[in-house]
């Protein structure tokens, strides 16, 4: 019987670090992974096949990856066939597999429909640090003439674009978690950086059989800044919405941290 673990989280939120850790622990993440680049020196650990599927769904909806609202996906027969083929192949070939792609936040119900027993590990980072990192990436790419300039400029022409994206993705995580609390675990990037025993927690909760690997075996402290920044949000209503979502994410991650205390008492 095959088991699945999906890694979900907004862009620049620590999902690559998390996926790298889980890969070392024995989670199969795909045959073809997105390679390292100047914004992610150790690689994204991102399944290109899944990334392309999500990109196609967004394109069919007239969108790109800069999503700022709930997506009502249009799934063509061709895309359904590709998803079904991927699921059948992976379930046949791997006892435990999963994938990581920030876009999956927008499509978690689709994957839950295809994989009813799948578990979701949701990783979040505070909005100020996450959006700062995203803007920094696009500033670097813009000045190195890498990728479409219109996309890079959009983050500076509309300063609230990145926070709106952060809100849309993390809201979808919370919606999924509210419907499937037993199949969702929420952690913060801070927890992982502070040596929370993530692999142990996953095995304890879902008995996945991962090798118990410490984050320090794969974590490069220089690769992810821990500098705290002020909120970049200009619109007060948006700031209030983001604050509410952050508080709920913090509550759920606190529940995950509480596993340590429960484990000590057991």
Please provide the spans of the model-predicted regions.
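A general structural signal for well-ordered secondary-structure junctions
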Residues: 28, 63, 183, 255-258
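PAPS-dependent sulfotransferase catalytic domain
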Residues: 56, 63, 85-212
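Electropositive, surface-exposed helix/loop patches at the edges of structured domains
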Residues: 65-84, 164-169, 245-262
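Exposed alpha-helical structural elements
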Residues: 49-56, 78-82, 86, 161, ...
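A structural signal for well-ordered alpha-helical scaffolds and beta->alpha junctions
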Residues: 15, 43-46, 76, 80, ...
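Pocket-edge structural micro-motifs
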Residues: 31, 100-101, 264
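PAPS-dependent sulfotransferases, especially Golgi type II membrane carbohydrate sulfotransferases
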Residues: 1, 174-177, 196-266
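PAPS-dependent sulfotransferase catalytic core
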Residues: 1-81, 218-226
């Amino acid at each position: 019987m095959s088991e699945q673990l999906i890694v979900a989280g907004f862009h620049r939120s620590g999902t690559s670090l998390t996926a790298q850790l889980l890969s070392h622990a024995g989670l199969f993440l795909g045959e073809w992974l997105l390679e390292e680049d100047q914004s992610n020196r150790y690689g994204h650990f991102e399944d290109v096949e899944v990334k392309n599927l999500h990109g196609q769904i967004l394109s069919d909806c007239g969108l790109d990856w800069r999503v700022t609202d709930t997506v009502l996906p249009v799934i063509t027969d061709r895309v359904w066939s590709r998803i079904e083929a991927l699921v059948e192949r992976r379930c046949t070939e791997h006892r435990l597999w999963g994938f990581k792609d920030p876009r999956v936040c927008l499509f978690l119900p689709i994957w839950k429909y295809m994989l009813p027993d799948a578990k979701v590990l949701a990783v979040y980072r505070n909005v100020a640090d996450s959006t700062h990192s995203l803007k920094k990436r696009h500033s670097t790419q813009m000045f190195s003439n890498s990728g479409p300039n219109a996309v890079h400029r959009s983050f500076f022409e509309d300063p609230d674009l990145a926070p709106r994206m952060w809100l849309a993705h993390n809201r979808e995580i919370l919606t999924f978690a509210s419907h499937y609390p037993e199949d969702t675990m929420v952690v913060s990037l801070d927890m992982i950086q502070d040596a929370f025993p993530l692999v142990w927690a996953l095995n304890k909760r879902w008995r996945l059989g991962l090798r118990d690997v410490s984050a320090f075996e794969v974590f490069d402290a220089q690769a992810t800044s821990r500098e705290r920044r002020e909120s970049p949000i200009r619109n007060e209503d948006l700031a209030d919405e983001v604050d509410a979502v952050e508080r709920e994410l913090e509550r759920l991650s606190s529940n995950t941290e509480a596993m340590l205390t429960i484990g000590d008492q057991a």
